[in-house]
Amino acid sequence: MRLELGKIFIKDVQFGEKTTVEKGVLYVNKQEIIDLAMQDDRIKSVNVELARPGESVRIAPVKDVIEPRVKVEGSGAMFPGMTNKVKTVGSGRTHALVGSTVLTCGKIVGFQEGVIDMSGPIAKYCPFSETNNVCIVVEPVEGLETHAYEAAARMVGLKAAEYVGKAGLDVEPDEVVVYETKPLLEQIKEYPDLPKVAYVHMLQSQGLLHDTYYYGVDAKQFIPTFMYPTEIMDGAITSGNCVAPCDKVTTFHHLNNPVIEDLYKRHGKDLNSVGVILTNENVYLADKERCSDMVGKLVEFLGIDGVLITEEGYGNPDTDLMMNCKKCTQAGAKVVLITDEFPGRDGKSQSVADATPEADAVASCGQGNLIEHFPAMDKVIGMLDYVETMIGGYKGCINEDGSFDAELQIIIASTIANGYNKLTARFY
């Protein structure tokens, strides 16, 4: 499967009469986005605001973040099974408005939604302090059930991102990158002397607002499967969860997975990247046994030499992580885990909730329990009403001027366990 990704670099975002891209500036028609969102009768009101790097702006509670993209050539359309009919994606040509996002925020869905600061000392922890953000502030109708509100907000974000992405349809990209993964036997024959490496991609699927979707299917409902990495770049996987914000894999992070990106960069040089093994993180032990068994069988069946594993969330999913590690090792593969840590505020507790002797190679994406001071900002997009009850916050943490103290895990993507962040841990 071969995908050309045309990157259109966005250096600013402004409101305009027409949603278009001109000389690196993304112009968006505010009313058209509002009208699109208000087609859902579960939504009471919508506002659209802009947040740019360096501005004194805080965004909260953030639900999902999405990079606007559009299919130019090839099968299917963005977000199959969600905003478009189910059809295999990952081939042809796709344009991305790099440096911009569409994000949803507003009244909290669950307690695990996050904060983005566009400037100040906290901005360095979040990648979205460096992007030009179209912020959709959503308010649900009175009495709407929580799951229905999550679904409505999720669809508003995806539809708005697809709408904005179409502005790049006829724009000549600043850069075109080609990604190609061939059918398995052909791929193996191409580099027979290089180690065969697969990426085991664990999707959040604990339920109770901890959900991820594969071609529109709730990840709880499938068993491990094998897929082309480029399918993920075309929106085959979308976020639908309110997991702890620090390691929440937003839809943006699925589209821009750094593990996939780095495997492509090293493909044909020192490794043979053969594809993605997709699995989930269901809560019941029987599900964990079943799915980790199948991950191990796929690794054995495909003759994989090396495996990289990422998880989403912490606590319960740490067991899936360790079971996958153990069974991939038993299948004959060398395994590296990529995860974040939660050792407590004093740093003395066990960093993950489970362990196995086979987990002897780990890349850390940082720890989420460090307390930082969040200074007041001139503007808040959304609201700060829920800071005390959000993961990382605590009773009495917020001050009258809007400043507060909280753990890093309240920040979107601060310790995201696929490496799209700036934190890590080192031995001294």
Curated annotation (Swiss-Prot):
Keyword set includes Transmembrane: no
Domain of life: Bacteria
Gene Ontology terms, MF aspect: sarcosine reductase activity
Residues bearing the modification Pyruvic acid (Cys): C242
Alphabetized InterPro entries for the sequence: Gly/sarc/bet_Rdtase_B_asu/bsu, Gly_reductase_pB_sua/b, Sarcosine_Reductase_Comp
PTM comment, free text: The peptide chain is cleaved into beta and alpha chains, and the alpha chain N-terminal cysteine is deaminated and oxidized to form a reactive pyruvoyl group.
Catalyzed reactions: acetyl phosphate + methylamine + [thioredoxin]-disulfide + H2O = sarcosine + [thioredoxin]-dithiol + phosphate + H(+)
The protein's Enzyme Commission number: 1.21.4.3
UniProt KW keywords: Oxidoreductase, Pyruvate
Subunit structure: Heterotetramer of two alpha and two beta subunits. Component of the sarcosine reductase complex, together with components A and C. PB is substrate specific.
Role this protein plays: In the first step of sarcosine reductase, the substrate is bound to component PB via a Schiff base intermediate. Then the PB-activated substrate is nucleophilically attacked by the selenol anion of component PA to transform it to a carboxymethylated selenoether and the respective amine. By action of component PC, acetyl phosphate is formed, leaving component PA in its oxidized state. Finally component PA becomes reduced by the thioredoxin system to start a new catalytic cycle of reductive deamination.
Official protein name in the record: Sarcosine reductase complex component B subunit alpha
Organism of origin: Peptoclostridium acidaminophilum (Eubacterium acidaminophilum)
Gene: grdG
